[in-house]
UniProtKB/Swiss-Prot annotation:
Its EC number is 3.1.1.-. The active site is at 221 (acyl-ester intermediate), 353 (charge relay system), 465 (charge relay system). It holds the Pfam family COesterase. Glycans are attached at residues 276, 386. It is found in: Secreted. The gene is CES4A. Probable carboxylesterase. Disulfide bonds join 88-116, 273-284. Belongs to the type-B carboxylesterase/lipase family. This is Carboxylesterase 4A. Keywords: Disulfide bond, Glycoprotein, Hydrolase, Secreted, Serine esterase, Signal. InterPro entries: AB_hydrolase_fold (IPR029058), CarbesteraseB (IPR002018), Carboxylesterase_B_AS (IPR019826), Neuroligin/BSAL (IPR051093). Residues 1-20 form the signal peptide.
Length: 550
């Protein structure tokens, strides 16, 4: 009997010690790979445990470059998790977009490294006996070229909605997507990183108070596209239970690179690694320093307007491929066949997707426009817009027929609408349609409010690409510079997103009712005054549907 009493007292001491750690300023979390020491912060009076720079893979360097991620090495003792890890190597404009999307009170300058497969966890402090909390995993956007976990502070969302917020980062650009189309470099390294992070969450999130059986993926732009793509991948099946795509889906035509070997050879030529043997080519690229890889990336001029080049030869960005591992077929094909994860899906767009940020990054001119110059611009970007040379006159007629050639304001507006509809809006509505037809719950939105407090862009009369992010992460509270109505909108959106994470339905409490997307095509217009809309951009979407069906 004495040994039973001794064992009981020991177990009680262990539980009390672990419990106490969660309620100290230096909380501990016991993962499968070792113990982490985080820090405790307060959002108002609510304590949040924060763990930063948590490894979910071995560093993807040396022989691990252009290879699938492997689980991290276990460590002895207690690992410090109170500072951000470096972010993945990326284009120089990543600093600008990080400043643009930053949800911290103060901007965090980025530090770059190829050793970058880390995530951050923001978790509410649980009272004894509390159930495990829903988990929300954020996929940053950035045209597959930029993006970082340290840009996003999940503490406001975690505190106000009692969810565990995980923010991941993955390899980018050449390092994240290079593919030779064969076994030497199948590609999709970034998506394999994402899947590795999801597997880490399944194995370890209980140590932070998260429920591995209630995981929601949410992301923006290219991050949203990856989420949409992973919904068609058997590798990701069972690793999440709901999905949210903000301004991006795998229906976007450029999500899949059709001829990856052609792109790889162009990169290899610029790097001095060109060879008929893909093994020698890849081995050569592995010998480059990170700085050399980024110099090659700059020479590729990703996501920049190529006005003098045949658009068929332009590589807009590195992106996923059909590799037979992550994707057995193009996700568009799988979506049309209803081969998609059986989970609820919330998705939407902003009403001014191509207003300032994307033209600024692309160096797309938005002044001194004439219809003649617009025609040339559209031809230069035709592969991005998914239109042929023969279709361009039809597109010009649809969007510019009633606009005077000297009315700069209207020309600019219609060009912005054209680009947004061709890239984000039409593909989002198609994705909503496919998921609805597959028989799973769908909720559609259009966000319409300008994001306050962003220092690097001019004020607009609507929501630019990414403007919704701050409202979902509670920036009106953490950063200030917001009206009471904007704070109310942020509270509303955090509640919608968290309700969806909890139940698969954004509705609940006193929130304005959000109807499910069905054959009536109802959606929610998110603004200071929230209302239900029907058939988003009906006339223009009918035009794009006719154009792509002919």
């Amino acid at each position: 009997m004495n040994w039973i009493l001794c064992l009981s007292l020991t177990l009680l001491l262990v539980v009390q010690t672990a419990w106490g750690a969660l309620h100290t300023k230096e909380p501990l979390a016991d993962t499968k790979y070792g113990t982490l020491r985080g820090k405790q912060i307060h959002v108002g009076k609510t304590p949040i445990n924060v763990f930063l720079g948590v490894p979910f893979s071995k560093p993807p360097v040396g022989a691990h470059r252009f290879a699938a991620p492997e689980p991290p090495e276990p460590w002895e003792g207690i690992r410090d998790a109170t500072t951000y890890a470096p972010v993945c190597l990326q284009e120089s404009w990543g600093q600008v977009t990080s400043m643009y999307f930053n949800t911290h009170k103060r901007y965090k300058w980025l530090h770059f490294s190829e050793d970058c497969l880390y995530l951050n966890v923001h978790a509410p402090v649980r009272a004894r006996g509390d159930p495990l909390q829903p988990v929300m995993i954020w996929f940053p956007g950035g045209a597959f070229l930029v993006g970082s976990a340290s840009t996003y502070d999940g503490s406001e969302l975690a505190a106000r909605e009692k969810v565990v917020v995980v923010v991941l980062q993955h390899r980018l650009g050449i390092l994240g997507f290079l593919s030779t189309g064969d076994s030497q470099a199948r590609g999709n390294w970034a998506l394999l990183d994402q899947i590795a992070a999801l597997r880490w969450v399944q194995k370890n999130i209980e140590a932070f108070g998260g429920d591995p059986g209630c995981v929601t993926l949410f992301g923006q732009s290219s991050g949203a596209m990856c989420i949409s793509g992973l919904m068609t991948s058997s590798l990701a099946r069972g690793l999440f239970h709901r999905a949210i795509s903000q301004s991006g889906t795998a229906v976007f035509q450029n999500f899949i690179t059709p001829d990856p070997l052609k792109v790889a050879k162009k990169i290899a030529q610029l790097a001095g690694c060109n060879h008929n043997s893909t093994k020698i080519l890849v081995d050569c690229l592995r010998t480059l320093s990170g700085a050399e890889v980024m110099r090659v990336s700059q020479k590729m001029r990703f996501f920049k307007l190529h006005s003098q080049e045949d658009p068929q030869k332009v590589v807009w960005f590195m992106s996923p491929v059909v590799d037979g591992v992550v994707f057995q077929d193009n996700p568009i094909v799988l979506l049309t066949q209803g081969q998609v994860a059986p989970v609820p899906y919330l998705l939407g767009v902003n009403n001014l997707e191509f207003n300032w940020l994307l033209p600024f990054i692309m160096k797309f001119p938005m002044s001194h426009l004439r219809k003649e110059t617009i025609a040339k611009l559209l031809w230069s970007t035709s592969t991005l817009l998914n239109v042929t040379k023969e279709q361009l006159p039809l597109v010009m007629e649809e969007y510019l027929r009633d606009v005077d050639d000297h009315d700069q304001k209207m020309l600019q507006k219609h060009v912005m609408d054209l680009a947004a509809d061709a890239t984000f809006v039409y593909s989002t509505l198609q994705a909503a349609h496919y998921h609805h037809n597959a028989g799973f719950p769908v909720y559609l939105y259009e966000f319409e409010h300008y994001a306050p407090g962003t220092i690097v862009k001019p004020r607009t009369d609507g929501a630019d690409h990414g403007d919704e992010i701050g409202f979902i992460f509670g920036s009106p509270f953490s950063k200030g510079h917001s009206s009471n109505k904007e704070k109310a909108l942020s509270l509303q959106m955090m509640k919608y997103w968290a309700n969806f994470a909890r139940t698969g339905n954004p509705n609940g409490g006193k929130l304005p009712y959000w109807p499910r997307y069905n054959k009536d095509e109802k959606y929610l217009q998110l603004d200071l005054t929230t209302r239900v809309g029907v058939m988003l951009r009906e006339e223009k979407m009918a035009f794009w549907k006719r154009l792509h069906q002919n």
